[in-house]
A protein has these predicted regions:
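Short, well-ordered alpha-helical segments enriched in acidic and aromatic residues
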Residues: 23-39
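Surface-exposed, charged secondary-structure patches
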Residues: 4-11, 37-94
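N-terminal amphipathic/basic helix or basic patch
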Residues: 4-15, 23-27
Length: 115
């Protein structure tokens, strides 16, 4: 039985969020596209790359951000090899763009702010 695209996208997003909270670099590695652009909605957008996200994850930077552990994922659209999703957690709200790769769905763009 194969997963639907929406199920696979939710799994990718959970790898990203739960990997962050748990300090699990393997899950984060799997979830993020090599060309990730992650930006925060703030006066200066800034930019986090995949390499920096893996570094921060390995340092356990997300462990204090778990809150109540809630991670609500909504897949808004899937069109061929691209998709968009949003995530609400106790700490973050994010909009994500994903791309289908030979290895599965990966997050290419993320725009976030604190909840």
């Amino acid at each position: 039985m194969t997963k639907t695209d929406a199920e696979a996208i939710v799994d990718t997003v959970l790898d990203y969020f739960e990997g962050w909270f748990d300090g699990d670099t393997a899950r984060m590695e799997r979830a993020l596209h090599p060309e990730l652009a992650k930006r925060r909605a703030a006066e200066e957008l800034g930019l986090l790359t995949k390499a920096r996200m893996l570094e921060l994850t390995g340092q356990g930077a997300g462990a204090e951000d778990r809150g109540d552990g809630r991670v609500d994922v909504t897949v808004h659209d899937v069109y061929g090899d691209i998709a968009t999703a949003s995530v609400d957690s106790a700490t973050y709200h994010e909009y994500l763009h994903l791309v289908r790769t030979p290895g599965g769905w990966q997050i290419a763009n993320a725009l976030w702010q604190f909840s």
